[in-house]
Amino acid sequence: MKVIFLKDVKGKGKKGETKNVADGYANNFLIKNGYAVEANNAALSTLSAQKKKEDKLAAEELAEAKALKEKMENLTVELKAKSGEGGRLFGSITSKQIAQALEKTHGIKIDKRKMDLPEAIRALGHTKVPVKLHHEVTATLDVHVSEE
């Protein structure tokens, strides 16, 4: 029997896939538990419409991420911190502080987990921070730490 998977089933298929499986397995397990539906014309047309909709949404998200990247590449986030001799900070600047400053000064809300800051900033000056906006788009944000 040909079925369309509604959920991922380990070893059998992923969501949205169309596959042939044994009739008993399809009727007694997959369809009964809501993991799949029988692949008839109506279900196939619904699946194709849903895939088109998902593709369109993914393209829109990618376009938004690219536009945000263009905007962020030209920005500088200014942060002030207390420092000692040689430009070393007392404490450090974290991705959370950068995200808050970005939202406060430029109105761009970015999740702190999207900032790829390997370790906190501990010195004065400019630092380039990569920000993963989308799995295909990474922007570079300029962070300037000056003395308070």
From Swiss-Prot:
One of its GO terms (cellular component) is ribonucleoprotein complex. Keywords: Ribonucleoprotein, Ribosomal protein, RNA-binding, rRNA-binding. It comes from the Bacteria. InterPro entries: Ribosomal_bL9, Ribosomal_bL9/RNase_H1_N, Ribosomal_bL9_bac/chp, Ribosomal_bL9_C, Ribosomal_bL9_C_sf, Ribosomal_bL9_N, Ribosomal_bL9_N_sf. Disulfide bonds: none annotated. GO terms for molecular function: rRNA binding; structural constituent of ribosome. PROSITE patterns: RIBOSOMAL_L9 (PS00651). GO terms for biological process: translation. Binds to the 23S rRNA. PANTHER family: 50S RIBOSOMAL PROTEIN L9 (PTHR21368). Belongs to the bacterial ribosomal protein bL9 family. This is Large ribosomal subunit protein bL9. It comes from Listeria monocytogenes serotype 4a (strain HCC23). The lineage of its organism: Bacteria, Bacillati, Bacillota, Bacilli, Bacillales.
